[in-house]
Amino acid sequence: LVCVMWGLHACQPATGLIVPSPIYVDNHYHGPADPEITWNPKTKEWMIFYTSRRPFKDQASYVGTPVGVAVSKDFVHWNFAGYCSFDGVGGKPDSEKTYWAPGVIVEGDSAHMFVTLKDDSTPVWGGPSNIVHFSAPLDDMISGWRRVNTVVDTPISIDATVIKNGDHWDMWYRDRPTEDTGGLYHAQSHDLYHWTLNGLAKGDINNVEVTKHTYQEGAYAFQWKGYFWIIADPHKGLAVYRSKDAEHWDYQGIIMYEPGTRFFDNTRARHPSVIIRDEKAFIVYHVQPFLEYNPDTHEAGNDIYQKLSFLQMAELEFKDGKLFCDRNKVLYE
């Protein structure tokens, strides 16, 4: 009540800054989606890589999309840093090829991106997609990306997330090799360059009887509070899974379905990533505040306003072995 009467500054720590809502707006097409947040130890800055959708392109809003980059030195102020170039091609808001859902990790002196790539950008959704591995030096994570190899070459593979797990790396991604085998799949590597595809992920992740989710995309994996977590996007809020071994997954339920009260946070959260900072977990996600969701479809929006998207940040909380999120909580830095 005091905050309402006297304004947020009355409750703000004297040395703190309020993390804005939204944290980032793409100044060109206003369509940032699928955010992937990471820390760059070389440049000492946080970076968000995102699918740069193009709401003003009518039928081509979701294809011809480059990977955009926002950076921050203080975790509060996020600025546009450019569009990624791959093998020297790109760096512009319009792309000949389609890039979706960049999964980015830092290992040693290099960064690695596992991105959904479509060579055919024919509207509305383009041609076949693969998950392709690119690498870049830490001091050039915008224009320094060079192709390594294709990790998954089935034609509907999308949305890779990669996590280091002891002496190896685990990857999860959305795939549908045949008409009746759609779901979240698992792969594993000991060097990031050679991958073994292990088929459908185990446990509750693909168990429709348990989750009631017939479709999920945009999975993100991370470790926190002694567990491995996967947060996926079934277009009905965010689905949370927990595991002790990153192999057998238990379903927790849905978070962040109910609208928030912060500016442009008034609808369900979509396709997130998480970063751990000072033992706290912060979730970054995109929202489409003007989209009227149809519960029976996975539509992305028809007109310009429905397709506009913004990036938001909230803090995750851990209680009694489960994840929670109060997306209305004001964040201070």
Question: Which role does the model predict for each range below?
Answer:
Residues 11-333:
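Carbohydrate-active catalytic/glycan-binding domains of CAZyme proteins
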Residues 1-15:
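Bacterial Sec-dependent N-terminal signal peptides
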